[in-house]
Amino acid sequence: MRGDAFSRCHPVVCFTFFFGAIACSAVYQHPAYLIASLLCAALYDLLLRGRRAGRRMLLALPLFLLLCILNPIFNPAGEHVLFVWLGRNFTLESLTYGVVIGGIFVSMLFWFDCYNRVLTSDKFTTLFGNLIPSLSLLLVMVLRLIPELTRRTAQLRGARRCIGKGADRGDTLRVRLSDGVAVLSALTDRALEDSVVTGDSMRARGYGTARRSSFQIYRMTGRDGLLLALELLLLTAAVLFGASDAEYFPTLTLARPNWAFALYCAYLLLPSALHIKEAVQWHILRSKL
């Protein structure tokens, strides 16, 4: 089995799902909705990337803990005081809100990781290349910038270690800072050179002189139409009828989730369900050979 079932859907289907999932993850502050978004994003990221996604999740854990701790330090609001340290109140409401903010940030990181894996630059160009060509190109370049810089940073560090100039964990802070500055300098030079080469290549190929075209032609099938309708139905019902109200200050007040919460979970699980369904079918077919 090659690829992912949801990745092979029409770009409109993929973009609609990620737009709804990321927007809801950023807006909803109810713990139940946040946990659902975080778990569904982590599940789909694991299905797409496997062990690499697991390593990224471990790296995201310190960031989550940092955001959880920072909010109670700078925001002493709330009625239920847990303890007092250095004259500042650390409240249950402030700590809970810090956990929520950290969860929102991490869940959006996972969703954007899945987005970069599923919605490639060619799919994004297919959707918006003819409507907003300059903006679509800018967004594509920005979305691929972080993964590209991360990959190049790893290459530069590996190359420096091979020639004996890299910093190890046991080195002093000065040595590690010097190594980091050298890597950053080389990374900046490489990025500037690539931007010049990209600009020259685009001018040589006649960028902006004619209507944009796509490398691959995507056609909306009946399956894509049904999936898109299901996405819109689940998302609309979850937004209109969901009980997602949450207040953290001055006291913690949470709405009790109703039946629409199940629709929200079903919406977030659509890509994972398609992936698992296809994987099961593939293994069944292989077992019959």
PLM regions: where:
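N-terminal transmembrane hairpin
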Residues: 1-126, 209-289
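Structured inter-helical modules in multipass membrane proteins
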Residues: 108-219
